[in-house]
């Protein structure tokens, strides 16, 4: 605001205080400089405390405006008109006014909440939109809005209106990541306090839940991942009967690899069981075909809440150049907005002992160097993140930062703007995992931390906590950050748009970009592309520079985002190897249909596709055939398991007919053309035919495992052969047997002879550095093995065995307590 002179410009002072009160949650000071101004202030404060007196405010405001006009002071007249406009707008958007109207509930039901400091004094455009669409009245909806427009508060208001109207006593929020579930749980606890029971389920696929939680008289908010919810209903099908409100956050997971199939079948199951009284909300910031999803999921019973006019916090998009400039663009990639000249100063680095070549920083062709340079310069203004396209790149960026320190480069801005105490604590925690000499530990002392999927959960939570509390200013991260984790980032430096070997999806990048300049954290932000080749070669047709530029600029256009597809539909779609080669999806699907009953169906498919590819393109030995076929196998197993669940809870003997109905209820079938629909029906039919060999009791057991029938049968056989319920095994014997069986039935990404030793060290609580000293394997490989192969796959496999074991009266031994404990130890890596 302009400088305020309270003696000559009272309206300006009132306006400043009011905006601080409404937007920044500051105290509202009563202006006693003029009697009429004081009356306006007191009536405003009374209104926001009680919800009463809106008409009186308008009358007092009219009188106050008249008095100011009579004083004939030009600046006071100017500001009193602005003040009147602000107050009238604030009253029209007031929570006291809108929430009772949108929810069709009496104001008294909102009164206690709106009097509390946690309540919003005005509703944001996103919250007004969901109100106007009837979501607060119980209307099911797809909510497609950009990140950072008030989604968390919207979820809270949806839940409050549902509880206040008695439409629901239990709400469940489903989010794709444990980190996101943690964040949502903390937000809900902060918002509701002791009013409701907030229960976050663990992500361990074990029976750590009970229907007894519904006995509590308090309203309940449950939070879990899609896999956990699917696991729960496969064990207790009537669990869903207790839920009145379903909220799916980041609800664009239908085509997320093999997880997508589980997600689609889960939502299809809920969709089929939900009554008109229950409410289903699916939220996503990047659902470009939201209308299509809404027609499938909700039909006439739901609405689409989306408005392109609602924008996220503004962000500037910059491109680095070898000329040391940054060029900024907005909506039109052909029209530059402005540029910042000579923003880089290249500095000579100290030579190491016996080093002759002079080295400089930053190297103007190195995207990572440019990102580090700008991060060091800008982090004093707010949090910065350097995006790395893979975990190995995270390490290389951190190694470069350490090298720069060793060569005498000044990184004081990064370290100086961090909380030294908190960084020391983080460094100590990092040392416990990786050792004192690991680059991650050293980087913590410099104010830099990593963030990626394989980082141990405790460390990742500590890093996110430090970021949220602004204890550090620079994080080097992968695309894991795009999946909904909210930390305060003002500057995002993109070193690459590739993820592994593929270009990042536009919607993934949009989600990543949405982490910057989030409302309530920063009012603006910047995304800077630090690979200078993109800008410098934008007009160059040689080597595809212009094509890469076009692909890059599309990333910033939310309207160009890929439509959300279906993993199940991928079963009948083409396998694309590269721009030259691929396989017709219908032919691949027909092969699977014809050979599905054979044990080696998918191995044979890999062999035939590989032979056909190499016969035509002998050089394409490094291809994605095995990965594509493996994805199809996992998707088929997900369908298989879901049909086991449905058949085990349905007395109808015509399983083919049931399978056909389930197929027709999927998003895949809704999106498919006629030929694809016919193939999908055949796929569901052959799976139903395979399942028809088993009785209800067997199917119930197989459904509980969340895996395919073939592996369930192998587990049954292994349990019987090893007399698990007849012979008492020590824990050591049990671990060895399980690891051996796991290796027989699973394929590791890398053949590792010391896998059993790593498992034992993991169970003993050894750190990565201790494992590295014993095995000589790179720490990055050990991270991958422990977080994926052991913590997820092996612990899940032990859970499968637990689900299949049946304890009878004649059994001598009950191995379940030991197996349950072992499952948790494998999950968390503790003794």
Predicted region positions:
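N-terminal helicase ATP-binding lobe
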Residues: 1-831
């Amino acid at each position: 605001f302009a400088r305020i002179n309270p003696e000559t410009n009272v309206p300006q002072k009132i306006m400043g205080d009011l905006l601080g009160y409404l937007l920044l949650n500051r105290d509202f000071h009563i202006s006693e400089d003029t009697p009429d101004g004081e009356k306006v202030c007191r009536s405003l404060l009374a209104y926001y405390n009680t919800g009463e007196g809106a008409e009186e405010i308008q009358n007092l405001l009219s009188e106050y405006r008249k008095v100011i006009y009579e004083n004939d002071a030009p600046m006071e007249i100017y500001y009193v008109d602005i003040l009147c406009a602000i107050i009238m707008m604030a009253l029209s958007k007031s929570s006291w006014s809108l929430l009772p109207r949108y929810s069709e509930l009496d104001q008294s039901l909102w009164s206690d909440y709106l009097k509390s400091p946690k309540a919003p004094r005005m509703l944001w455009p996103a919250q007004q939109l969901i109100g106007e669409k009837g979501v607060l009245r119980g209307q099911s909806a797809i909510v497609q809005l950009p990140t950072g427009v008030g989604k968390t508060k919207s979820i809270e208001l949806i839940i409050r209106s549902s509880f206040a109207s008695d439409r629901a006593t239990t709400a469940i929020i489903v989010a794709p990541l444990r980190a996101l579930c943690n964040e949502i749980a903390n937000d809900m606890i902060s918002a509701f306090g002791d009013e409701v029971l907030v229960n976050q389920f663990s992500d361990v696929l074990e029976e750590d839940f009970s229907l007894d939680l519904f006995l509590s008289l308090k309203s309940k908010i449950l939070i879990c991942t899609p896999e956990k919810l699917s696991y729960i209903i496969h064990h207790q099908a009537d669990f869903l009967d207790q839920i009145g409100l379903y909220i799916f956050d980041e609800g664009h997971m239908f085509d997320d690899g093999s997880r997508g199939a589980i997600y689609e079948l889960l939502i299809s199951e809920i969709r089929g069981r939900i009554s008109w009284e229950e409410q289903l909300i699916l939220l996503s910031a990047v659902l470009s075909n939201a209308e299509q999803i809404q027609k499938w999921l909700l039909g006439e019973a739901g609405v689409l809440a989306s408005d392109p006019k609602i924008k996220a916090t503004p962000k500037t998009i910059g491109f680095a150049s070898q000329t040391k400039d940054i060029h900024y663009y907005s909506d039109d990639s052909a029209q530059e907005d402005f540029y910042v000249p000579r923003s880089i100063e290249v500095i000579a680095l100290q030579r190491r002992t016996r080093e002759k070549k002079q080295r400089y920083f930053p190297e103007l062709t190195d995207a990572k160097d440019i990102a580090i340079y700008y991060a060091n310069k800008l982090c004093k203004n707010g949090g910065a993140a350097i995006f790395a396209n893979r975990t190995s790149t995270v390490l290389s960026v951190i190694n470069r930062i350490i090298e720069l320190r060793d060569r005498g480069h000044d990184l004081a801005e990064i370290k100086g703007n961090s909380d030294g105490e908190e960084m020391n604590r983080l460094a100590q925690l990092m040392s416990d995992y990786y050792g004192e000499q690991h680059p991650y530990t050293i980087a913590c002392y410099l104010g830099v931390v990593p963030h990626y999927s394989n980082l141990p959960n405790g460390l990742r939570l500590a890093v996110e906590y430090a970021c949220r509390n602004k204890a550090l200013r620079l994080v080097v991260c992968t695309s894991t950050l795009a999946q909904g984790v909210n930390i305060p980032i003002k500057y995002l430096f993109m070193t690459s748009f590739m993820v592994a070997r593929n270009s990042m999806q536009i919607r993934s990048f949009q989600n990543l970009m949405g982490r910057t300049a989030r409302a309530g954290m920063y009012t603006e932000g910047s995304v800077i592309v630090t690979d200078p080749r993109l800008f410098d070669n934008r007009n160059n047709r040689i080597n595809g520079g212009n094509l890469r530029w076009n692909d890059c600029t599309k990333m910033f256009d939310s309207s160009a985002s890929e439509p959300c597809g279906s993993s199940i539909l991928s079963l009948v779609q083409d396998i694309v190897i590269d721009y030259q080669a691929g396989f017709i999806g219908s032919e691949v699907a027909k092969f699977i249909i014809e050979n599905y009953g054979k044990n080696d169906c998918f191995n044979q498919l890999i062999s035939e596709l590989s032979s056909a590819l190499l016969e035509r393109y002998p050089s394409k030995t490094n291809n994605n055939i095995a990965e594509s076929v493996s994805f199809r196998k996992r998707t088929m197993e997900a369908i298989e398991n879901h049909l086991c669940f449905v058949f085990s809870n349905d007395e109808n003997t015509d399983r083919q007919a049931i399978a056909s109905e389930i197929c027709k209820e999927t998003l895949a079938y809704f999106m498919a053309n006629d030929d694809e629909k016919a193939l999908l029906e055949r796929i569901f039919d052959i799976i139903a035919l395979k399942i028809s060999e088993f009785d209800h009791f067997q199917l119930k057991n197989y459904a509980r495992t969340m895996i395919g029938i073939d592996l369930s049968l192998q587990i049954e056989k292994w349990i019987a052969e090893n007399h698990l319920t007849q012979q008492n095994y020590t824990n050591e014997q049990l671990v060895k047997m399980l690891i051996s069986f796991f290796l027989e039935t699973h394929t590791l990404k890398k053949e590792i002879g010391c896998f059993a030793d790593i498992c034992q060290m993991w169970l003993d609580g050894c750190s990565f550095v201790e494992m590295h000293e014993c095995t000589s394997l790179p720490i990055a490989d050990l991270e991958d093995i422990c977080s994926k192969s052991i913590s997820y796959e092996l612990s899940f496999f032990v859970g499968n065995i637990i689900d299949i074991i049946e304890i009878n009266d004649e059994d001598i031994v009950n191995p379940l307590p030991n197996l349950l404990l072992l499952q948790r130890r494998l999950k968390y890596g503790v003794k």
